UniProtKB/Swiss-Prot annotation:
PANTHER family: NICOTINATE-NUCLEOTIDE--DIMETHYLBENZIMIDAZOLE PHOSPHORIBOSYLTRANSFERASE. Pathway: Nucleoside biosynthesis; alpha-ribazole biosynthesis; alpha-ribazole from 5,6-dimethylbenzimidazole: step 1/2. This is Nicotinate-nucleotide--dimethylbenzimidazole phosphoribosyltransferase. NCBIfam families: cobT_DBIPRT (TIGR03160), PRK00105.1 (NF000996). The lineage of its organism: Bacteria, Pseudomonadati, Thermodesulfobacteriota, Desulfuromonadia, Geobacterales. It comes from Geotalea uraniireducens (strain Rf4). Its EC number is 2.4.2.21. The active site is at residue 318. One of its GO terms (molecular function) is nicotinate-nucleotide-dimethylbenzimidazole phosphoribosyltransferase activity. It catalyses: 5,6-dimethylbenzimidazole + nicotinate beta-D-ribonucleotide = alpha-ribazole 5'-phosphate + nicotinate + H(+). Catalyzes the synthesis of alpha-ribazole-5'-phosphate from nicotinate mononucleotide (NAMN) and 5,6-dimethylbenzimidazole (DMB). It comes from the Bacteria.
Length: 352
């Protein structure tokens, strides 16, 4: 079996018994039942995922995957593709939004070149695992071969496996790739059957005329490639991206290893959607960091069955929302681990 087949075979439902045990433990804390709302949800889900009533949350990593997109030559983005490697250098210097927010929540950022059209020198903090120098223009033909899509997925699975071996408690997804809202919209349109117009927004801030053009390009790509909605690998290969594939792999690897994975915004959720279409139990391991301004994001979240943690009108990507949400998930787990019980505090319990 290859890495993908192994990961898919290992994914099991989360532990319902541990979920109930976590809730019982939370109910003994010095508070009215359920009064910490979603923080309690985060704690019990974390326990059910890991199988540990005293889970560790110390080591958190946001993997920011970078890749270029051939469809950019159609003029679908406000920025040129040269910005992708420029932003990779910004990540490595610690100057990007994800770096700032990860420092704030105590997470590490690891940058992964899975498909940038640029030759990086070996650099501390950069993982070079390039499958190709970007995708091909899916307005004219498939973005990738099926083999390339699987290879990029396996980059993500491999990173999840290494993170598990390192004792990482929580994984986060992020991305960088000029033009990558275009394949993300194509993926949700192909899988859901929604019209391209319903799921396509402004990405980096394009104007009305450019948005109409972007919609036409995606419609053309879907017509040319005819991705099979029943085959997520076919959708990914024909209209997806290398970084989206690697995110799908990281999510699959996390689920196979019983690790919580926090997905960022629209592009990250495209990867998570591919993963959950490959194995429906994947959704039980996902924490959705936030709901993006991108209109297609809600359709993705609904199909996965994930309720976003934050709604801050974010649309940057990189892993910014994932880094922020990690802090709230960790707060919920700390309530479970550190808050006193009624008995410990000598406080009378309520009668329900």
């Amino acid at each position: 079996m290859n890495l993908l087949q192994e990961a898919l075979a290992k994914i099991q439902p989360v532990d319902a018994v541990m979920l109930a045990k976590a809730q019982a433990k939370l109910d003994k804390k010095t508070k009215p039942l359920g009064s910490l709302g979603r923080l309690e949800e985060f704690a019990r889900r974390f326990v059910a995922i890991t199988g540990d009533l005293q889970p560790d949350t110390a080591k958190k990593i946001v993997f920011t995957f970078a890749g270029d997109h051939g469809v950019v030559e159609e003029g679908v983005s406000a920025f040129p593709k040269e910005v992708t490697p420029q932003m990779v250098f910004n990540f490595l210097r610690g100057g990007a939004g994800v770096n700032v927010l990860a420092r704030h929540t105590g997470a590490e950022v690891r940058v992964v070149d899975v498909g940038v059209d640029f030759d990086f020198e070996p650099t501390p903090g950069l993982i070079i695992d390039k499958v190709a120098k970007g995708t091909r223009n899916f307005a004219k033909g498939p973005a990738m071969s099926r083999e390339e899509a699987i290879a990029a997925i396996e980059v993500g699975i491999g990173l999840a496996n290494r993170a598990k071996a390192e004792g990482v408690a929580m994984l986060g997804t992020g991305e960088m790739g000029i033009g990558n809202t275009t394949p993300s919209s194509a993926i949700i349109a192909a899988i859901s059957g929604k019209t391209v117009k319903e799921v396509t927004h402004r990405g980096t801030g394009i104007n009305d005329a450019a948005l109409s053009h972007k919609i036409r390009v995606i419609e053309q790509g879907l017509a040319v490639n005819k991705p099979d909605p029943r085959d997520p690998l076919d959708v990914l290969a024909k209209v997806g991206g290398l970084e989206i594939a690697a995110i799908a792999g990281l999510v699959l690897g996390a689920a196979a290893n019983r690790q919580p994975v926090v997905i960022d915004g629209f592009i990250s959720t495209a990867g998570a959607l591919i993963a959950s279409e490959l194995n429906p139990h994947v959704k039980e391991y996902i924490f959705a960091a936030h709901e993006s301004v991108e209109i297609g994001h809600r359709f993705m979240l609904d199909r996965i069955g994930a309720e976003p943690i934050l709604d801050l009108k974010l649309r940057l990507g990189e892993g910014t929302g994932a880094a922020l949400a990690m802090g709230l998930i960790e707060a919920g787990v700390k309530i479970l681990k550190e808050m006193a019980t009624f008995e410990e505090a000598g406080v009378a319990e309520g009668e329900y």
